[in-house]
Structure formats: structure tokens, C-alpha cells
Design a protein with these regions (language model features):
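Conserved hydrolase catalytic core segment
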Residues: 146-188
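Conserved alpha/beta-hydrolase "acid-adjacent" motif
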Residues: 294-300
């Protein structure tokens, strides 16, 4: 376990973005701790990062854990400094005890043995159910460490299915649920596979160029130039590909990403079936989405929202001029404002 301290100045940044809400963050010294925790499966450890205001007691209703999507780890997006501060920094500076976790196969977490073999040598690995198990290990670690019974849970993209599945089975451990770009049943059928296509392997290889093209796919041409702050894509890509020790063995460098999520998408979301039942979620839930999300279009978030039939309350926010990765774009403070508006509000009496 490693711990370090970071002095960040957030007053001006937050004052300009949150002045309308009358909020102003003071300078905060954040304590950062990196830990490897057991997954509960032999030989598999999970990377967990924690940030919170140094020297401040933990508030039981201000603890949040974030889980990533299908291709990239949590650390290099949620904790990527943009203009000096990351989304994780911003939330922690508001007095939150913030965690991120990488499920097995991603970031600094253990890569299953199949990832050291050619992808075609094994079937897809790390299903959504396995990833939800890993999220559960992180939640239990945090509950034990902070001696609380519930925490806030946030997932992005595939992480919404990880977090949603987990919450549907463990409502008693979740205070609030945030789903950023949720997966749901697709209208369009999957692209037909070629007759000679190879079976889906254990993992796939992803290049930086393909990541950039995917990021900007549905952004109008005249809006692309200033969508991503200068240097952010390069900083994110360099940090992300550096998490894979085998990326440099390819030219160009290639990031390994597990294919369990792809198999689940083919067998469920693209086959007209739900992977789990959102109707089993019984905690306050926020859905965040951006209008130019090419990976998971708006109708998916709307369809998912309709299935949240047993939450005490629910909210769907559509952000303008943003993509699947709005959290790292020019309108990231819109994202932050809506997120904190949900997390900061007091519980209804019925939930106390």
C-alpha cells in the first residue's frame, strides 16, 4: 500500500463552474492511497485507489467507488489531471472519500493467465458477472475499512452493467447509484459475422488511433477541434497504454482488453435480452448521458430509465456537446455539477 499527499487549488476552477449554485470549494490537501486487495479468487488481486481530504473524518454518506468500462482502466480516466485536477480530485475536494477499482484484466489489477497466451487460445474471459464479483470485493473492502454499511457506487459504460448487476443483488450495501452512459437492449441487430470469422478470443487488441476515432465518431465535424482539451487525448492515451506491460510488444502499441464484455453484449444486449433486471434496484439512481455518445446512444439510457420501477427516485440527465467520454472533455464541469447535485442532496425521510 502506498500513500501520498497532493495540494490542489480548486477554488477558481470550481467557483467559475459552480457559481450559479452558490458553491465554492476551498483549497484542499488530498491524501491518496493505492492498495492491492484480494478478489476472493486465488492469484487475483485488484487495484484500488483512494482519495480524500487529509486530516478530515470520513462522513458515512460521502463515500463513493467508481468502476470503469469495457476497454480502459479506471485510473487513467477518472483520475487523469485535466488543467491540474482530475474528476476524482474534484469529488474528493468536496469532502468525499473517493475510490476507484480496476477489475481483473485491467490497469494494475492481476491479468488472468489467459492474457499471457494468444487471444485465440482461449474463450472470452472476465464476464460482467465476474467483474461484478470484483466490484463486490472492493465494496466489502471499503465497508470494512470505513466501518459503514453502505456506500455510493458509480459505473461508466460497461461499468454501469457491473454496478447495476451488483446493486440489483446487494441493495443493502449501496447508498446511491450513478450510471454514466448505461448499457441496455439495442434496437439494431449486431453486424453479421463473416462466414470465415474466427471465434471470439479471450481478449482483443486496441490501438490509440482506433481509440481516437471511436471517441470522435458522432461529433459534428465543426465541433471536433475544441471538444477535447489540448493535450488531454495524448496524456490519457499514454497513461492508459502504459498500464499494459505488453503494449509495447506491438507496433503500434496495442492495449489488451478482455472479451467477456463483448460476449455478454452479443448474448444479451444485442440479442434483445437483459443481462440483469434493473427493476430489482431499490436505491436512488442517477443516469448521466451525453448527446454525442456513439457507443451507447441516448435511446439506451431512456430505455433503461423506464425499467427502474422500484427506485425511491430516479433521474436522467442528458448533457449537451459531449460524447461517451464527456468526463474528460470541455463540458466535464457540466458532468461534475449534475453528479454532485445528486450525491450532495439530502436523503428523503423515507430513506433515513
Amino acid at each position: 500500500m502506498t500513500t501520498r499527499f497532493l495540494q490542489i487549488s480548486l477554488a477558481c476552477l470550481l467557483a467559475s463552474s459552480l457559481a450559479g449554485a452558490g458553491a465554492l470549494a476551498k483549497d484542499r490537501k488530498l491524501e491518496t492511497t493505492d492498495t492491492m486487495i484480494p478478489s476472493g479468487d486465488a492469484g487475483i488481486q485488484l487495484f484500488v485507489r483512494n482519495k480524500h481530504p487529509a486530516g478530515k473524518p470520513t462522513s458515512p454518506d460521502k463515500i463513493l467507488v467508481f468502476v470503469h468500462g469495457a476497454t480502459y482502466p479506471a485510473e487513467t480516466a477518472f483520475d487523469l489531471p485535466i488543467e491540474g485536477v482530475s474528476m476524482m480530485d474534484l469529488i474528493a475536494a468536496r469532502g468525499y472519500d473517493v475510490y476507484l477499482v480496476d477489475v481483473r484484466g485491467y490497469g494494475r489489477s492481476t491479468r488472468p493467465a489467459e492474457m499471457s497466451q494468444p487471444p485465440e487460445a482461449n474463450k472470452p474471459i472476465v464476464s460482467t458477472a465476474v467483474a461484478a464479483h470484483d466490484l463486490g470485493a472492493a465494496v466489502d473492502y471499503i465497508l470494512g475499512k470505513r466501518k459503514v454499511s453502505k456506500i455510493d457506487v458509480m459505473g461508466w459504460s460497461w461499468g454501469t452493467s457491473i454496478a447495476g448487476l451488483y446493486t440489483s443483488e446487494h441493495n443493502d450495501k449501496v447508498n446511491r447509484l450513478v450510471l454514466y452512459a448505461p448499457q441496455w437492449i439495442r434496437r439494431e441487430p449486431p453486424a453479421p459475422a463473416a462466414a470465415n470469422a474466427a471465434p471470439l478470443g479471450a481478449y482483443r487488441l486496441v490501438s490509440k488511433d482506433s481509440a481516437k476515432a471511436r471517441w470522435l465518431k458522432d461529433v459534428p465535424a465543426d465541433k471536433q477541434a475544441d471538444l477535447i482539451p489540448p493535450g488531454v487525448f495524448e496524456a490519457w492515451a499514454d497513461a492508459t497504454w502504459a498500464t499494459d506491460p505488453e503494449a509495447g510488444k506491438h507496433n503500434p502499441p496495442m492495449l489488451r482488453a478482455t472479451n467477456g464484455v463483448v460476449e455478454d453484449s452479443l448474448n444479451y444486449w444485442s440479442a434483445g435480452k437483459a443481462l440483469y433486471d434493473p427493476g430489482k434496484i431499490t436505491v436512488p439512481t442517477l443516469l448521466l448521458h451525453a448527446e454525442w455518445d456513439a457507443d451507447l446512444p441516448s435511446y439506451l439510457a431512456q430505455g433503461y430509465f423506464a425499467q427502474l420501477k422500484n427506485t425511491p427516485y430516479k433521474r436522467l440527465i442528458e448533457l449537451s456537446e459531449g460524447t461517451h467520454t464527456v468526463m474528460m472533455e470541455k463540458n466535464r464541469m457540466q458532468f461534475f455539477r449534475e453528479l454532485m447535485g445528486f450525491l450532495d442532496e439530502e436523503k428523503p425521510l423515507a430513506l433515513k
